């Protein structure tokens, strides 16, 4: 498993399909070892969810979209939120990705929770934003909040991601 560099990421962005669609400013979003994703929207998480072994009883909690102010900012009190990214990711069958919050979030008492991004996944993903800071946290629309780190696999997978989140939020 090898972490991809910005040079390798640029080639994958120019490929078809592009590794990353809908980037706001790809030159800013490409980092030495990853790609930064930007904030499209913030939602509340209302109610409980459920997960089981075969997903037949999976339930996702509801939530409502929070509005940014006229200046593009939103103040989030301490709590948990769901965030949606602007970018659509197309992960080739020989790569997987791990996401990490930008260090600025952590320095502000806020973090992101996310899962492994599987080979073959395509979509505009969501993550959980956790505001630990008792004073809250301000976010501006389109802020760079997460960095995706792409790794080459030892071999291409035979079957890529095919779960319910395939092509999520792309329409």
Swiss-Prot record:
UniProt entry tagged with the keyword Cell membrane: no
Keyword set, alphabetical order: Hydrolase, Nucleotide metabolism
Keyword Amino-acid biosynthesis: no
Chemical reaction(s) catalysed: dUTP + H2O = dUMP + diphosphate + H(+)
GO molecular function, one term: dUTP diphosphatase activity
Pathway it works in: Pyrimidine metabolism; dUMP biosynthesis; dUMP from dCTP (dUTP route): step 2/2
EC number: 3.6.1.23
GO biological process terms held by the UniProt record: dUMP biosynthetic process; dUTP biosynthetic process
InterPro entries referenced in this protein's UniProt entry, alphabetically: dCTP_deaminase, dUTPase-like_sf, dUTPase_archaeal, dUTPase_trimeric
Record-linked Pfam families: DCD
CDD domains to which the protein is assigned, alphabetical: trimeric_dUTPase (cd07557)
Physiological role: This enzyme is involved in nucleotide metabolism: it produces dUMP, the immediate precursor of thymidine nucleotides and it decreases the intracellular concentration of dUTP so that uracil cannot be incorporated into DNA.
Family: Belongs to the dCTP deaminase family. Archaeal dUTPase subfamily.
Protein name per Swiss-Prot or TrEMBL: Probable deoxyuridine 5'-triphosphate nucleotidohydrolase
